[in-house]
């Protein structure tokens, strides 16, 4: 049975009739809608979902709007369209779809039989949108682009999060340019956790930083001094690639007051020729750290290997594959043909 999920509509009177689609969105309405969500999108200091939706709609509309709709679909035609899952998976992007539909035409009404994060099976009709057919078709591709990508990310995240237990699965910064908020939101919907949003919200000392600084200890010392001088408090993670580097980090931390919070254990998972993995180095590193810092395994993480990695005792497992090469979930949105024809006959356009 379908149930209606309330959503604050965002007006855009020219989305259908104006020759040029200039997207505007109320920041207050967007904030209120986001705050009501069960799984809220992550925050960013310089842009938000408003900006993401603006760009997606405006790049589709160009300077003339939907010329095909103008030629073939009467503006007054009313219809409804159904969301259909064409394969099994976890659906994500329902809340974002509502924001997009409301931006194109606030009179559109949406009903859903599921929520973000729920599982769907092939052939399930899980939602519908009712209103002007013109508006539905204008929003269709943008809505599906987001929903299919987000659902693909959420589906893989759910599978990896379940397999990784008791470790927590994280994504990385390997997201689609301009879509990091959306990609990371999908990870949350799928049951994962977010790594740092960008370069600004966590110190992450990687191999290039270590090489430029002259070693692990020097890099850590520089970070500690920088944070203290600038009165900054944030998480600090350092990448290690060998047991020797792990020991160097632990030695530094034993001698120095440090802001270090997490140690990355990079590529300590060794793939074997038979498809299995060797995790003895990872086990040794986790034992040496012994809970003094959070640990994060990275490298050679797949759906097939993540369970064994999770059993080593690491706190986190990060995987770029969650977002950088995810397979979109096949979802369609089809207008009710009979209803459209009936209205079309009345308007002499069918």
Curated annotation (Swiss-Prot):
It comes from the Eukaryota. Gene3D superfamilies: Aldolase class I, Quinolinate phosphoribosyl transferase, N-terminal domain. InterPro entries: Aldolase_TIM (IPR013785), NadC (IPR004393), NadC/ModD (IPR027277), Nicotinate_pribotase-like_C (IPR036068), Quinolinate_PRibosylTase_N_sf (IPR037128), Quinolinate_PRibosylTrfase_C (IPR002638), Quinolinate_PRibosylTrfase_N (IPR022412). Its EC number is 2.4.2.19. The keyword Transferase applies. Coiled coil: none annotated. Pfam families: QRPTase_C, QRPTase_N. Disulfide bonds: none annotated. Keywords: Alkaloid metabolism, Glycosyltransferase, Pyridine nucleotide biosynthesis, Transferase. It catalyses: nicotinate beta-D-ribonucleotide + CO2 + diphosphate = quinolinate + 5-phospho-alpha-D-ribose 1-diphosphate + 2 H(+). CDD domains: QPRTase. GO terms for biological process: alkaloid metabolic process; NAD biosynthetic process; nicotine biosynthetic process; quinolinate catabolic process. PANTHER family: NICOTINATE-NUCLEOTIDE PYROPHOSPHORYLASE [CARBOXYLATING]. Involved in the biosynthesis of pyridine alkaloid natural products, leading mainly to the production of anabasine, anatabine, nicotine and nornicotine, effective deterrents against herbivores with antiparasitic and pesticide properties (neurotoxins); nornicotine serves as the precursor in the synthesis of the carcinogen compound N'-nitrosonornicotine (NNN). Involved in the catabolism of quinolinic acid (QA). This is Quinolinate phosphoribosyltransferase [decarboxylating] 1. It comes from Nicotiana glauca (Glaucous tobacco). The gene is QPT1.
